[in-house]
Amino acid sequence: MAVALAPRGRQWEEARAFERAVKLLQRLEEQCRDPRLSMSPPSLRDLLPRTAQLLQEVAQARRAGGRGDPGDPGGSGNFLVIYLANLEAKSRQVAELLPPRGRRSANDELFREGSRLRRQLAKLAVIFSHMHAELQALFPGGRYCGHVYQLTKAPAHVFWRERCGARCVLPWAEFESLLGTCHPVEPGCMALALRTTIDLTCSGHVSIFEFDVFTRLFQPWPTLLKNWQLLAVNHPGYMAFLTYDEVQERLQAYTDKPGSYIFRPSCTRLGQWAIGYVSSDGSILQTIPANKPLSQVLLKGQKDGFYLYPDGKNHNPDLTELCQAEPQQRIHVSEEQLQLYWAMDSTFELCKICAESNKDVKIEPCGHLLCSRCLAAWQHSDSQTCPFCRCEIKGREAVSIYQFHGQATAEDSGDGSHQEGRELELGQVPLSAPPLPPRSELPPRKAKNAQPKVRFLKGNFPPAALGAQDPTPA
């Protein structure tokens, strides 16, 4: 009988934890009504009701789904226990900073820009933003997807699934040990700094979502921890848990020194960087650069005279060692796949949306290929999902397709050890794809012994290296 009651007992405890968390967030929302607490994103006044609503959706889906998972380590039940306990702890920290309910007056220091209390509140707002994004990613629409969550970078996805299986969260100590099997971590201060960077929600655990964000920020995978060390530990321009407003405030001291800059993980676009810098006329601009390794963006910005003085300091670290050319990945298109394209009176390399330009972009994480012009037009229409499979677009990578005659799978020059061909799965035009425009002409069919090859070119994406200026807080 005790065994039979165990799942029901877990459900009851989980339901109570949801209720406590929602009520706590609602009380915090009442404490945040002072208009002076209105900040640029992430704003607690905006995040608290959205998080409460999402929690209610998750709770409702859990009730409708019955028992859910049996409480296995790293599953949805285990994640929620960790998440709700952390949410309660962070909520109480916020409550201690805010005026009690029913009292409008508060410590003036809380509203003074740059004060200790204001900084603490801003950092907690960033953590709440991370927690909302994590819950939304692992429970879209309230339903758990952590066991099938797709990391953006393919090598990171392979690492997680091979070593962590279907789990979506691990204690830090276990994760550190697993990561050390392919990226050794120095014990002591370096390991503590790494934990601070990866553990976005400050829970003492690492979720698959947090690891996804980390590997996007410090790509590419082969030099992941080296990138992190040079960019986050040693670089004076790196700022953690900083908001848009705080970047503006910090750079105010350097408005007479154009080229001063700092960079931080974006608060609103997790997995991307936001760079603030002083322009030639002394104004402060913030931008989210194109999806490419940060080291390449900073080097290009240094060359162009934008990023010269990290946090106002005269010494700008040399990042050229992070920009070594990576081995090109090759995709082999089989004879059977080519026959299917020929049967459609098309070719593999032709973009299946416009049917005019060749494919030159790979969408991450789904891997679909199209031309950069069509992707830009698609995203300009405010769509952030793949036009073929509707998977969220988290990144993009430039590709180059060229004709290859014969059966070899590697170029003549260079070491061919990394140039093994692999099959590319078809699926470029699922049923949900947008309709193709009329085509008056198509290129002639290629000879059957001519097979297109695909090269993935790191850091060679067509848009401007520095990215467009972001008009909204990041």
Regions found by a protein language model. Give the residues of each.
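Ordered, helix-dominated protein-protein interaction surfaces in large eukaryotic regulatory proteins
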Residues: 27-30, 57, 177, 181, ...
